[in-house]
Amino acid sequence: MEALVYTFLLVSTLGIIFFAIFFREPPKVPDRGSK
């Protein structure tokens, strides 16, 4: 069960870092207005 917990923590940390960098730097993809 410990492996599952460690994997969950690792994925959560990577997700938070990814979103932090994504929101910090504006996406270079041209926005069409919808999404």
Curated annotation (Swiss-Prot):
GO terms for cellular component: chloroplast thylakoid membrane; photosystem II reaction center. The chain crosses the membrane at residues 3-23. Keywords: Chloroplast, Membrane, Photosynthesis, Photosystem II, Plastid, Thylakoid, Transmembrane, Transmembrane helix. Coiled coil: none annotated. The keyword Disulfide bond does not apply. It is found in: Plastid, Chloroplast thylakoid membrane. The keyword Thylakoid applies. It is a single-pass membrane protein. One of its GO terms (biological process) is photosynthesis. Pfam families: PsbT. Its main location: plastid. PSII is composed of 1 copy each of membrane proteins PsbA, PsbB, PsbC, PsbD, PsbE, PsbF, PsbH, PsbI, PsbJ, PsbK, PsbL, PsbM, PsbT, PsbY, PsbZ, Psb30/Ycf12, at least 3 peripheral proteins of the oxygen-evolving complex and a large number of cofactors. It forms dimeric complexes. Belongs to the PsbT family. This is Photosystem II reaction center protein T. It comes from Stangeria eriopus. The lineage of its organism: Eukaryota, Viridiplantae, Streptophyta, Embryophyta, Tracheophyta.
